[in-house]
Design a protein with these regions (language model features):
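Conserved N-terminal beta1-alpha1 strand-loop-helix module at the mouth
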Residues: 1-91, 99-127, 141, 152, ...
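Short alpha-helix immediately C-terminal to the canonical SAM-binding loop
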Residues: 94
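Glycine-rich beta-strand-to-loop/alpha-helix junction loops that act as flexible
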Residues: 131, 162-166, 184-186
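Acyl-donor (CoA/ACP) binding surface of acyl/acetyltransferases
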Residues: 144
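C-terminal binding/interaction regions
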Residues: 181
Length: 208
């Protein structure tokens, strides 16, 4: 990552949402904050439900020239006209997703706290890797990624890196010099005004 370039915002959807209401919030966000990519982290297991949720968001995102990727379901991504897929299992299915979607698709991989897993994902064709959480949390085993993983990666590896999970203004300010993207989602959706909360978090990027 170039130290002269500020990290970009990668927006993660809530796991469930009303498409019309979500698109209204997205319109506000797009008007206020530059968004590099939107990820649909939909928890639904019904193909029809995923399609109903994806279609209006795709139309809106593409109208604003914002790429849209889908969590996990890489077999659906191309059919739905999406730009790619985000995988949560590290390097395990990157090669299969790349084979299914081709070279032009965006394929990202969440690699938890493991630098080795991130390197493996990159070798298998990932376009970016995400590590996290970066802050203290009580989810899973409670582990958080060490800052030196980002320091080493940003100094050594050209593949873009994403900071994800337990983001707050202090963590964002700390990691801004050593990451390419901040994946922001759960941090804003419980707020009455998600767009305003996103802007508040993004202020920590510009403050560095």
């Amino acid at each position: 990552m170039s130290q002269e370039q500020a990290p970009q915002v990668y927006l993660i959807s809530p796991p469930s949402f009303d498409p019309q209401a979500f698109c209204a919030v997205l319109e506000t966000i797009f008007a206020q904050t530059p968004i590099a990519c939107v990820r649909l982290a939909i928890s639904a297991h019904s193909e029809d439900q995923i399609i109903r949720m994806c279609d209006p968001v795709r139309e809106l995102a593409h109208r604003h020239d914002v790429p849209l990727v889908l969590d996990e379901h890489y077999m659906l991504a191309e059919r739905l006209g999406l730009d790619g897929v985000h995988l949560d299992d590290g390097a395990k299915t990157v090669a299969a997703a790349r084979k299914a979607l081709g070279e032009d698709a965006i394929i990202g991989s969440f690699c938890g706290t493991s630098r080795h897993e991130g390197m493996s994902a990159g070798e298998r064709g990932a376009d970016y890797v995400a590590f996290g959480p970066i802050g203290a949390n009580n989810l899973g085993d409670g582990r958080q990624v060490e800052r030196d993983v980002f320091e080493w990666w940003s100094a050594t590896i050209e593949l873009p890196i994403v900071a994800q999970g337990a983001l707050d203004p202090e963590g964002i300010a700390s990691f801004a010099p050593i990451t390419d993207f901040f994946a922001i989602g759960a941090e804003i959706w419980d707020h009455e005004d998600p767009a305003a909360e996103l802007a508040r978090l993004c202020a920590a990027i510009s403050a560095t």
